[in-house]
Amino acid sequence: AQRFAIENRALMAESIINKTGWKVISSFDSIHNYIDLEARILRKGATDASQGKYLVIPLNMRDGAIIAIGKGNEDWNCSAPHGAGRVMSRTKAKENVSLAEFKNTMQGIYSSSVVESTLDESPFAYKKSGEIISRIQDTVKIEKIIKPVYNFKAKN
């Protein structure tokens, strides 16, 4: 299953690159929720942050994602969080986040996906970016934070 997932991501990326005509400068794979057979680690809610390994830590629809390099910290099992983590369940987010709040916080980011059916994916449903950034310094070196220009979420 893990090999299939790797190949599937590569094919999706290849399709997008071919259709857009973009030039690939560099690339890396950053997977989460998997069994690292080589290190004998089950990474649930985590991604590989081995020494020198590039990884992505998604924040939310508004704030983007962290591009980082692993420090290989054994105290963290050479791992890092695979995302910001929820502060609200999908149900709670749909009950507590208004569409007006969601639209307001997403100003400046083009998206046709800021709608009622994606309230559970709003930035309010996730931990604040600053909280994540301040807590991962022992396991990764942050290279950059990429900000979304366009954000798309599938609806139902």
Where are these regions (language model features)?
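Domain-length cofactor-binding catalytic modules of enzymes
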Residues: 1-156
